[in-house]
């Protein structure tokens, strides 16, 4: 079914509450394991329908944040999703406490019960806090989506600025950068206020649910069953020792290549004197060549991308009133992934058509899973599929960039390597924030700047506002997806492993990757790494092992 034809009707919350309540009662009164198994399967179908409805409304508002109808629907879900989650927790508790635990584990797997255990942290006390949190996230999104940045007489949104920041003319770059920074500086009070309120709301929710702070609660809500914040801190140390020095070397090399002695932050997005490699065509050109690429990559990826095109399951081009960024979601009732992005004519468009397609492909391959909980893995594992797809498609980059394909590959690898120290900065900052919920906005910004100079010691913003520690205002995950960001870095280390293996044995690596995609979320992060034949970034020396190999690979790309 095409996305535009998917019907939308606001759920009747009284009926929804009744189904949750009846399911809980049926689980409790079931006399046979087979009876409970059927109830759980029926409940899974109900949830697929319900969450598909929620996602249709979410995507349509993302495409036009001024659409009054879907804005009202979004407000409705901001109020009611916490209620739905709490009702779902009660059903989860009934299943978790089942007298037929052995039979249920045999049918659905032990991991299902680990996920249920994570859900049990919520109860009705969380509802008002989650409602407030949702409203604050929407408020942040609207400010960004409706941004108006005036540069050289033209008006841009935040998501339309990246091409300007990559311009080979340094003065042009600097002016564009200053215009973008001014938008965030003009809204400093709003961003500080929204985030301060978010931190307090989340901390109060954690206390209400019996947690010392929000960190432990959110780790549970992220279904992190294999590791805790202490393990993440050790991993950040690994990054500091391996990739921070390499990133500094890479930027030094970039400065020399550009002929710049006083390298600044606004120079980082420009990789070559004659400009970055941008795709040789518009959105239709990109989609057409992506279809050819995915058909040639494998039968599975070809079928998947044909399905996405046929059912119009992508909204790709940046435009006014559209939410910033890119994401992949799914309408599981229709077994359909969906890709949302903001194409802007840069190499980032190809990053999206591979990254978000990696998410979508995994979702497409795991739609056969019995439970909705198993269609998507936890975020740490989910980002492996997307980041790996960026590398698995390297042999086809000539389709998009022609003779500049190697420049794209260099920029992609350089960007991935230098990204990780930034990613752990964002994570470390959030741990500080929720360990110190009473810190003032000024204290938060000061701490952020300390941390970014620790992980990126050569950073020079050439701007007082950003030097005050305000860069994170533009990182939406800090506002609406706390502690998610470290997952990008963990997955990137896994994607690097697939890249190095792919260059050695394409067929075998692709087979491992597809096997991992099919597994969906049926196992925990650490177990999925085993399924995908990947070494664990947290408890092995893989980062130390691959860093010199990646440096060698980067330097070997002829540009």
Please name every model-derived segment:
Residues 341-366, 383-386, 391, 429, ...:
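Active-site recognition of the HExxH zinc-binding catalytic motif
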Residues 317, 353, 361, 388, ...:
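C-terminal, non-catalytic "cap/extension" segments appended to globular domains
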Residues 195-206, 211-212, 250-251, 358-368, ...:
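Long, well-ordered alpha-helical segments
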Residues 1-276, 289:
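A well-structured
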Residues 121-122, 180-187, 227-233, 269-279, ...:
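Glycine- and acidic
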Residues 229-230, 253, 257, 297-300, ...:
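Inter-helical turn/loop segments and adjacent helix faces that build the functional surface
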Residues 241-242, 366, 377-405, 412-414, ...:
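Post-HExxH zinc-binding segment in Zn-dependent metallohydrolases
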Residues 274-334, 346-347:
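Auxiliary, metal-adjacent structural segments of Zn-dependent hydrolase domains
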């Amino acid at each position: 079914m095409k996305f535009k034809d998917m019907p939308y009707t606001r759920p009747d919350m009284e009926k929804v509450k009744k189904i949750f309540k009846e399911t809980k009662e049926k689980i409790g009164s079931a006399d046979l394991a087979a009876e409970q198994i059927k109830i759980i399967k029926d409940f899974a179908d109900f949830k697929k329908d319900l969450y598909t409805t929620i996602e249709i409304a979410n995507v349509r508002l993302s495409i036009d944040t001024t659409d009054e109808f879907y804005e009202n629907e979004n407000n409705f879900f901001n109020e009611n999703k916490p209620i739905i989650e709490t009702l779902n927790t009660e059903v989860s508790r009934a299943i978790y406490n089942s007298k037929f635990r052995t039979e249920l584990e045999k049918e659905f797997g032990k991991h299902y019960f680990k996920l249920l255990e994570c859900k049990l942290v919520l109860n009705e006390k969380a509802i008002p806090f989650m409602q407030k949190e949702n409203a604050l996230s929407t408020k942040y999104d609207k400010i960004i989506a409706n941004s108006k940045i005036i540069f050289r007489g033209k008006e841009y949104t935040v998501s339309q600025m990246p091409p300007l920041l990559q311009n080979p003319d340094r003065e042009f770059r600097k002016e564009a950068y200053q215009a973008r920074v001014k938008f965030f500086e003009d809204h400093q009070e709003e961003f500080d206020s929204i985030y301060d309120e978010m931190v307090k709301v989340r901390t109060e929710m954690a206390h209400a649910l019996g947690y010392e702070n929000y960190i432990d609660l959110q780790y549970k809500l992220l279904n992190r069953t294999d590791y805790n914040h202490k393990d993440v801190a050790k991993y950040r140390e690994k990054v500091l020792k391996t990739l921070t020095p390499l990133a500094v070397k890479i930027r030094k090399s970039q400065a020399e290549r550009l002929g710049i002695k006083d390298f600044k932050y606004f120079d980082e997005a420009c990789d070559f004197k004659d400009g970055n490699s941008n795709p040789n065509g518009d959105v239709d050109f990109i989609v057409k060549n992506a279809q050819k690429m995915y058909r040639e990559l494998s039968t599975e990826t070809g079928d998947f991308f044909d399905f996405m095109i046929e059912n119009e399951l992508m909204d790709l081009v940046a435009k006014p009133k559209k939410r910033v960024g890119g994401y992949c979601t799914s309408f599981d009732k229709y077994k359909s992934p969906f890709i949302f992005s903001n194409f802007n004519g840069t190499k980032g468009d190809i990053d999206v058509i591979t990254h978000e397609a990696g998410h979508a492909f995994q979702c497409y391959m795991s739609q056969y899973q019995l439970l909705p909980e198993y269609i998507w893995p936890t975020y740490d594992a989910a980002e492996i599929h997307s980041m790996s797809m960026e590398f698995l498609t390297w042999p086809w980059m000539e389709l998009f960039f022609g003779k500049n394909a190697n420049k794209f590959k260099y920029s992609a690898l350089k960007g991935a390597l230098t990204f990780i120290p930034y990613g752990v900065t964002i994570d470390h900052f959030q741990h500080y924030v929720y360990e110190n919920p009473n810190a003032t906005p000024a204290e938060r910004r000061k701490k952020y700047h300390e941390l970014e100079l620790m992980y990126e010691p050569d950073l020079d913003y050439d701007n007082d506002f950003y030097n005050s520690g305000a860069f994170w205002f533009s990182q939406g995950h800090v506002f609406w997806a706390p502690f998610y960001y470290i997952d990008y870095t963990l997955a990137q280390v896994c994607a690097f492993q697939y890249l190095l293996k792919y260059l050695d044995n394409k067929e075998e690596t692709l087979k491992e990757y597809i096997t991992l995609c099919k597994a969906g979320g049926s196992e925990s992060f650490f177990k999925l790494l085993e399924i995908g034949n990947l070494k664990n970034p947290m408890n092995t020396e893989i980062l130390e092992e691959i860093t010199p190999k990646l440096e060698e690979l980067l330097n070997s790309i002829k540009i």
